UniProtKB/Swiss-Prot annotation:
Function: Cell division inhibitor that blocks the formation of polar Z ring septums. Rapidly oscillates between the poles of the cell to destabilize FtsZ filaments that have formed before they mature into polar Z rings. Prevents FtsZ polymerization.
SUPFAM superfamilies: Cell-division inhibitor MinC, C-terminal domain
A biological process from GO: regulation of cell division
NCBIfam families for this protein: minC
Composition bias type Basic and acidic residues, residue spans: 113-132
Keywords assigned by UniProt, alphabetized: Cell cycle, Cell division, Septation
Region (Disordered): 113-138
InterPro entries: CAP/MinC_C (IPR016098), MinC (IPR013033), MinC_C_sf (IPR036145), MinC_N (IPR007874), Septum_form_inhib_MinC_C (IPR005526)
Family in the record: Belongs to the MinC family.
Protein's name according to its UniProt entry: Probable septum site-determining protein MinC
């Protein structure tokens, strides 16, 4: 081995978790011609919004009896309008097999709630000289337990929960999140990119904690010596720090 050859012990890469914004195209029926026309109309509203946008093709909501999807043809239609397919979401065997045949990643069917994505018409033409002053909104305070399946969002401010948060519950805030009870669900602070946001938990047993898109899941959190303790979570660079309160 030459002296210039790197040692095996020296890492050449690092795997990091990050929550990325990816458009999901949920196909309602198997009609590529109609899709081509409707996509053209949508893209015409804001071309740069869709240009080279990463895309997941969701085929798992297609009604029964729609027939076999021409997956390469579907991808060509999307690509012609600037959308780059990263993966498909599917449950039918034929769709999964078609994706595997062209080495396209397959995601499991989603149970999460997704909202329609609508570009702002004329957003490229109107560029304000300076960003508007942020609107300060009061802290959102929840006094009752947050049950599994519930989602609570504090838009423009902090979220305070003076009770427990069950597994499957989701807390979101543009600012900080405070939980004065067992935290067993998901807590996502600074969801619009505020890297100074923090999460405060009286008892950290969460499924996921996230600040400004950087996150740790329960498998990572359980290995932390402060699992189950009273902690705060902050972000330093792209690293989440867990500190005892």
């Amino acid at each position: 081995m030459s002296q210039t050859e790197p040692l095996d012990q020296d890492p050449v890469f690092q795997l990091k978790g990050s929550m990325l914004a990816i458009t999901v195209l949920e196909l309602a029926r198997n009609d590529l011609d109609a899709l081509d026309r409707q996509l053209a109309a949508k893209v015409a509203l804001a071309p740069n919004f869709f240009n080279n946008a990463p895309l997941v093709l969701a085929l798992d909501k297609l009604p029964a009896g729609q027939g076999v999807i021409d997956l390469p043809g579907l991808m060509r239609v999307c690509r012609s309008h600037g959308l780059r397919t990263l993966a498909i979401r599917a449950s039918r065997i034929e769709d999964i097999a078609a994706a595997i045949a062209i080495e396209l990643p397959v995601l499991p069917p989603s149970g999460a709630r997704e909202r329609p994505l609508e570009p702002l018409v004329g957003e490229e033409k109107k560029k304000p000289e300076k960003p508007p002053e942020p609107t300060i909104k009061p802290t959102k305070i929840i006094t009752s337990p947050v049950r599994g399946g519930q989602q609570i969002y504090a838009q423009g401010g902090d979220l305070v929960v003076i009770s427990s948060v069950s597994p499957g519950a989701e807390l979101l805030a543009d600012g900080n999140i405070h939980v004065y009870g067992p935290m067993r669900g998901r807590a996502l602070a600074g969801i619009k990119g505020d890297t100074k946001a923090r999460i405060f938990c009286q008892q950290l047993t969460a499924e996921l904690v996230s600040i400004a898109g950087q996150y740790k899941v329960s498998e990572d959190l359980r290995r932390d010596p402060l699992w189950g303790a009273s902690v705060q979570v902050n972000l330093s660079g792209d690293v989440l720090n867990i500190i005892r309160l």
